[in-house]
A protein has these predicted regions:
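Helix N-cap and loop-to-helix transition residues
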Residues: 12, 37, 63, 90-91
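Catalytic cores and adjacent binding grooves of peptidoglycan-active enzymes
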Residues: 75-83, 87-136
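N-terminal start-of-chain detector that recognizes signal peptides
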Residues: 28-30, 55-60, 90-94
Length: 136
């Protein structure tokens, strides 16, 4: 699989792979190809389609070195696959729409921040569903 390979209609391998260029991993581009990846990305594509607007992935998979360097939780879903998504234009209403639709679609993890929403499918691997809001 090359970095230009599309995983879904609107999301590519490159967008999801580890981009730790400013970290100790040097941008290793790792991305485990697993059932969890496809499950999560099918849901993310469906969310994007329902939203009717493009989403920027600001963080996808992280290797352990990258995750440590950004202060990620030791058991972060980004070590598997999670996506921090940001609507273009950082529109607050669109962030709320992303949160609402993600909840309706039963994403396993939904975390709302000032400029992005964290989405993951932790339930797929047996983790407890989680919701949090870190907006200031």
């Amino acid at each position: 699989m090359t970095t230009n390979t599309q995983i879904t209609e609107n999301f590519s391998y490159k967008e999801l792979s580890c981009k730790g260029a400013d970290t100790s991993c040097g941008g290793c581009n790792s991305l485990p190809i697993t059932d969890l990846l496809y499950y999560h990305m099918d849901k993310l594509q469906a969310l994007r389609t329902r939203l009717g607007a493009p989403l920027r992935i600001t963080s996808g998979h992280r290797c352990e070195r990258h995750n440590r360097s950004v202060g990620g939780a030791p058991n972060s879903m980004h070590l598997h696959i999670a996506t921090d998504v940001q609507p273009f234009g950082e529109n607050e209403e669109v962030l709320q729409d992303v949160e609402k639709i993600a909840g309706e679609m039963k994403f396993g993890g939904i975390g709302v921040y000032n400029s992005f929403v964290h989405l993951d499918s932790r339930d797929f691997i047996g983790r407890e569903i989680a919701r949090w809001n870190n907006q200031t």
